[in-house]
């Protein structure tokens, strides 16, 4: 009986080391599982970090234009600025160029004060004109012109001059007359007057006047009804 107990004890003791050897195996599996879990967590964190960085890069890239598109946008901006500058220059320069390119005849057709003419006179085609708007007879107008040096009552030279002066003073005496209805029309300088004068058949209408309808005749002593002025002329050689 003691032998059996001893054997059993030995067997039991012999079996105990096996059990003791199994326990380390259980510890190793627990450690390895823990390490795997830690590794998996670290891996997940790394992946999450990489994914976050990738998303940030994507958003950053979305806020920027690719180089070709950026270059195109810059070129379009430069073109717009150049075109706007050209339009502004055109708007500013066209009136200036038109004024400078206007012909001398066009410039002289405009009534304007001239430094070479007396004050309150106007210039047209190298001549100075004084527009007298007072109501006077033909004789009074002739005397008013004679009182000014180198001036005379106007005698029309051409159609352009006649239209120009009629636009300024629609009714005015001119330096043209006739002695009777049977005599020719002459200027105050004694030269034959070549332009047609309407209503010249009346015996008492021996003085000519400029009207919007052209040249007409009237009584030399008349200053009635229509406000008749007069035009004095002084011819000068004006510098351009």
Swiss-Prot record:
Q: What residue ranges lie in the Extracellular compartment? A: 94-240
Which domain of life, per UniProt? Eukaryota
> Which residue ranges are assigned to the Cytoplasmic compartment in the record's topology?
1-70
- Which Gene Ontology terms cover its molecular function? carbohydrate binding; transmembrane signaling receptor activity
Q: Which residues form the signal peptide?
A: none
Q: Which GO cellular component terms, listed alphabetically, does the Swiss-Prot or TrEMBL entry include?
A: external side of plasma membrane
According to its UniProt record, in which tissues is this protein expressed? Natural killer cells.
Q: Where is this region: Disordered?
A: 1-31
Q: What is this protein called?
A: NKG2-E type II integral membrane protein
Q: Name the lineage.
A: Eukaryota, Metazoa, Chordata, Craniata, Vertebrata
Name the gene. Answer: KLRC3
